[in-house]
A protein has these predicted regions:
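Short hydrophobic "helix-edge" motifs at membrane interfaces and signal-peptide entry regions
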Residues: 30-31, 125-126, 297-300
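A polyampholytic, Gly/Pro-enriched intrinsically disordered region
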Residues: 145-165
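Conserved His + Asp/Glu catalytic blocks
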Residues: 140
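Acidic/histidine-rich catalytic cores and adjacent linkers
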Residues: 110-120, 137, 160-396
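Intrinsically disordered, low-complexity acidic/Q/S/K-rich activation/interaction tracts characteristic
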Residues: 93-95, 117, 133, 152, ...
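Generic recognition of stable, solvent-exposed alpha-helical segments in well-folded globular domains
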Residues: 8-12, 63, 115, 131, ...
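RNase H-like nuclease fold core
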Residues: 3-104, 111, 115-123, 135, ...
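Acidic, His- and aromatic-enriched active-site or binding-groove loops in soluble protein domains
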Residues: 126-137
Length: 396
């Protein structure tokens, strides 16, 4: 498209990415009454937070699949050192100048976001607040598992197996690494391992002639038998919330979501073996029934803010070590990841955005970065010194 005569450098690639990001973030959006905002904070190791507001119009919500990056626009992106309900309210209000008041705001229930959205809804009564389904499920899972002593013992067992099998020929049987952050949003991998290792143990017991490795593995994982009943409960719980999440990703939130789910999947729920999983399903579906009341007849609203979590993950990967200090101009890269990018749009972005605009945006939004401070310090010298090391080492 650009008739390049040589392969661009990595810095050129980065520059193009930031230019496209700047173009998408600062471009004019259509004023309409059907925008849905997806809001969340990213927290770095310092005190800075990044409030990101993504937007998608109701008319553009995809059918039969979850949102992709290309479906959404970045409405606003604001690094802040402190965040309160008042600050969030002002940020949403400022963003609404670009799009008109949103029809809905989807988020988790972080206290500052919750308060900010509540105040904005006083300003704009037609705006509704939708609680992210995955966060709600994680909260329900947390309430169940925190009271379950077996879960704590199972995690200890998993850690024991991980240590015993580490750096051995049996390392492939280790459990997945347990995450402390958002651990109740990510239980499925550990539960699946528990189910699989239980099956493996049963087969080892049935094996009459075992290899040395099989004897060792059977010994290490023997305690999985203690958790057989609990693993069955947890496995069914995971099956339940994955089924509901898949349904909601396809249908989104509608005024009859609860009824439609039962119409399609009541038979699956009836086949559940454990009362705990059945009760868990009722809790999630009761939440959906409550949420669907905000929808108008024949209206589809978004139910999930997971795309914003994914976008933050991409940013963290790009920032790498820099993410341990503060934000940089790389936050603009998120603008390059979203929206539909055609050759014409890319051409416009590269022609209309220069490095000066990016530097000015970074200075206004982020301020002087730690990276810039280090660069300045590196240039400071009391006197000009340029020694020829070869000359100094010569013997007269």
């Amino acid at each position: 498209m650009f008739n390049l005569k040589r392969t661009p450098s990595i810095n050129s690639g980065k520059s193009w990415m930031l230019k496209l990001g700047y173009y998408n973030i600062t471009k004019t959006q259509t004023i309409a009454d059907d925008w849905i905002y997806i809001i969340d904070h990213s927290i770095q190791m310092g005190k800075e937070k990044l409030l990101l507001i993504l937007g998608v119009r109701v008319k553009d919500l995809p059918r039969d699949r979850a949102l992709k990056y290309e479906d959404v626009e970045i409405i606003d992106l604001q690094p802040v050192k402190t965040s309160t309900g008042e600050v969030v309210y002002e940020q949403i209000k400022e963003a609404s100048k670009k799009t008109g008041n949103p029809r809905a705001i989807v988020s988790d229930m972080g206290s500052d976001i919750k308060l900010g959205v509540k105040k904005f809804r006083e300003f704009s009564p037609s705006t509704v607040h939708v609680y992210d389904l995955k966060h709600k499920i994680a909260l329900l899972v947390k309430k169940i598992l925190e009271k379950d002593d077996e879960w704590g013992e199972f995690k200890k067992f998993a850690n024991f197996v991980a240590k015993k099998l580490q750096n051995s020929t049996l390392a492939g049987y280790r459990p997945p690494k347990q995450k402390e952050k958002a651990r109740y949003m990510n239980i499925e991998d550990l539960v699946r391992w528990g189910d699989q290792i239980s099956i493996k143990y049963e087969r080892l017991q049935e094996t009459k002639v075992k290899t040395e490795d099989e004897i060792k593995l059977e010994s290490v994982i023997a305690d999985i038998a203690k958790f057989e009943q609990s693993v069955e409960i947890w496995t069914e719980m995971v099956m339940v919330f994955q089924l509901i999440e898949r349904f909601m990703n396809i249908h989104n939130l509608q005024r009859d979501s609860y009824e439609k789910f039962y119409e399609l999947h009541e038979g699956k729920l009836q086949k559940l073996k454990t009362e705990e999983a059945k009760g868990f399903a009722i809790q999630i579906l009761s939440f959906i029934k409550e949420q669907q009341e905000v929808c108008n007849q024949n209206e589809r609203l978004l139910h999930s803010s997971q795309i914003i979590e994914s976008l933050f993950g991409k940013l963290k990967f790009l920032e790498k070590e820099q993410s341990k200090s503060n934000f940089t101009s790389l936050v603009l890269s998120m603008g390059a990841m979203v929206s539909k990018s055609t050759p014409d749009i890319l051409k416009k972005a590269l022609e209309s955005v220069n490095v000066k605009k990016i530097k000015q945006w970074t200075k206004e939004k982020i301020g002087i970065t730690i990276q810039a401070q280090k660069k300045e310090l590196h240039k400071l010298k009391r006197v000009e010194q340029k020694w020829d090391s070869t000359e100094e080492l010569r013997v007269a």
